[in-house]
Curated annotation (Swiss-Prot):
Increases the formation of ribosomal termination complexes and stimulates activities of RF-1 and RF-2. It binds guanine nucleotides and has strong preference for UGA stop codons. It may interact directly with the ribosome. The stimulation of RF-1 and RF-2 is significantly reduced by GTP and GDP, but not by GMP. Coiled coil: none annotated. GO terms for molecular function: GTP binding; GTPase activity; translation release factor activity, codon nonspecific; translation release factor activity, codon specific. One of its GO terms (cellular component) is cytosol. The gene is prfC. It comes from Lacticaseibacillus casei (strain BL23). This is Peptide chain release factor 3.
């Protein structure tokens, strides 16, 4: 591909993640976006446990049963001349590590907030990560079809709790049973609720008001809306694209994903204002531009058994620069070895199509036979490239894991190896006895691991809790196995690095007092 062609293709890419607290309606809005992208013909009510409909983005068996997202799905489609890459992320807090890594692979984020509840705990956590990255954040205030909090309070909360300016792109005319429509400040029109096609749009005059002949003008809620708009115009934040690009201001859209109200307006604005792929920093201190003709990418996720019939593993890579071509040779930075990328795919949750070419900003799945690790960099060219490390969390909960049937050791070990490589749970082995210990950020990760071991590898496992522990790594040169005591457990991680699992903070303090020269470290 010629340089000008590459630049043109890269400029079409819009790659973003959707973040929210559980049940704010993230999966529902994802489905509506796919509907506009022409990818699906109908959007089911997403809690599949009751309706029998399953969200397109919830593809794993346990997700369908429980109505929660526990993996990051990737969905791609074309819309208005742009190539959209959506990364749907787990809303459940136990899967925040997977979500954090996903946020490293996007150029923007969409924050979905339940307008009845406002900003919730998980949204706060995820917002922090997006804020640290300095990428644009677009806010969708969802569930307008239900009674919720005052819109002015919701805008104020963005500033008070998250420290980001909010600019209302549209404004609700009523809510719940009294919802009449949306006042569109950008397109200077009113979008009526429960109307189809262009009939739902009413133009505003130069004063920002409807023609007096319109029935809505007789409604007191319309008058209240005009007062709110006047207040926003006089005392609210001014739209500032520079601030939006820096992640200092968020455009706020109101709507209802369930009734598909306000979603199309949101998508059109998002495509218009969201950034195209930008440069990415390297460990060497430089940065790689997306229009650099030499291919480079990084692995942000590994997923086993997306197709249970084939027991496959897919490494999800974000292309940072250049053009991907199936069959190309690349260098894996961690090993220095050259490898050929023959098998590649693009996604719609669990369905996939072979992809022959892709460019910077795209997400590609590579069939993995065990070569890749999360955070790996692959590249072409003479100059070695390694992108910045992805975040890794220190687990807080630990269990000892054994196979229930000792005759099924082979499937037990295969399942352990593949699921641990996905990064949702961490694997440790005790010194001398080589017992398997699993670590996780939350209890749900263990439940998902147990479920998948049984259903995907036919290996029933016994998990014995060893409680909440504090994990601290130690320099191998300073390690003496006599340091292990009843207050700590000496283990090694999958890289062979030693660490102690302390019973509590007192045990860690006792250790620090006894061995003042020993340095212990945590992950994130």
């Amino acid at each position: 591909m010629k340089p000008q062609e590459l630049a043109k293709e890269v400029a079409k890419r819009r790659t973003f993640a959707i973040i929210s607290h559980p049940d704010a309606g993230k999966t529902t809005i994802t489905e509506q976006l796919l509907l506009f992208g022409g990818v699906i013909r109908e959007a089911g009510t997403v809690k599949g446990r009751k309706s029998g409909h399953f969200a397109k983005s919830d593809w794993m068996e346990i997700e369908k049963k429980r109505g929660i997202s526990v993996t990051s799905s990737v969905m791609q489609f074309n819309y208005q001349g742009k190539r959209i890459n959506i990364l749907d992320t787990p809303g459940h807090e136990d899967f925040s590590e997977d979500t954090y890594r996903t946020l490293m692979a996007v150029d923007a984020a969409v924050m979905v907030i339940d307008s009845a509840k406002g900003i919730e705990a998980q949204t706060k956590k995820l917002f922090k990560v997006v804020k640290q990255r300095g990428i644009p954040i677009f806010t969708f205030m969802n569930k307008l079809d239900r009674d919720g909090r005052e819109p002015l309070d919701l805008i104020a909360e963005l500033e008070d709790l998250l420290g980001i300016e909010g600019y209302a792109m549209n404004w609700p005319i009523g809510m719940g049973k009294g919802l009449k429509g949306l006042y569109d400040r950008v397109n200077q029109r009113i979008e009526l609720y429960r109307r189809e096609g262009d009939d739902r749009f009413l133009p505003l005059n130069d004063q920002g008001q409807l023609d007096p002949s319109q029935p809505l003008t007789q409604d007191s809620i319309y008058t209240q809306t005009l007062d709110d708009i006047e207040l926003l115009n006089d005392a609210g934040n001014q739209f500032n694209l520079k601030k939006i690009m820096a992640g200092e201001q968020t455009p706020v859209f109101f709507g209802s994903a369930l009734t598909n109200f306000g979603v199309e307006t949101f998508l059109n604005s998002f495509v218009q204002y969201a950034p195209e792929p930008g440069p990415k920093k390297t460990e060497q201190g430089g940065e790689v531009n997306p229009t650099n003709p030499e291919f480079s990418a990084f692995v942000f996720k590994i997923q086993a058994n997306m197709n249970p019939a084939h027991r496959d593993r897919i490494a999800f890579v974000r292309i940072v620069s250049g053009e991907f071509e199936r069959g190309m040779d690349v260098i894996l930075h961690r090993t220095g070895k050259t490898m050929r990328l023959n098998n590649s795919t693009e996604f719609m949750a669990d369905t996939r199509e072979t992809v022959s070419t892709a460019v910077a900003g795209d997400i590609v799945g590579l069939y993995d036979t065990g070569n890749f690790q999360i955070g790996d960099t692959i590249y072409q060219g003479k100059e070695p490239i390694q992108f910045e490390k992805l975040p890794q969390f220190t687990p807080e909960l630990f269990v000892r894991v054994t196979p229930k049937n000792v005759m099924k050791q082979k499937s037990f070990h295969k399942g352990m190896q593949q699921l641990v490589q996905e990064g949702a749970v961490q694997l440790y082995k005790t010194y001398n006895t080589n017992d398997y210990i699993l670590g996780a950020v939350g209890q749900l990760q263990f439940e998902v691991f147990q479920f998948r071991m049984l259903h995907e590898y036919h290996s029933e496992v016994i998990m014995t809790p060893i409680g909440s522990r504090t994990a601290r790594w130690i320099n191998p040169d300073q390690l003496d196995e006599k340091m292990s005591s009843s207050r700590n457990l000496l283990v090694q991680d999958i890289h062979g690095d030693p660490l102690f699992l302390f019973e509590n903070q007192y045990a860690e303090r006792w250790f620090a007092d006894k061995y003042p020269d020993v340095k212990l470290t945590a992950k994130m």
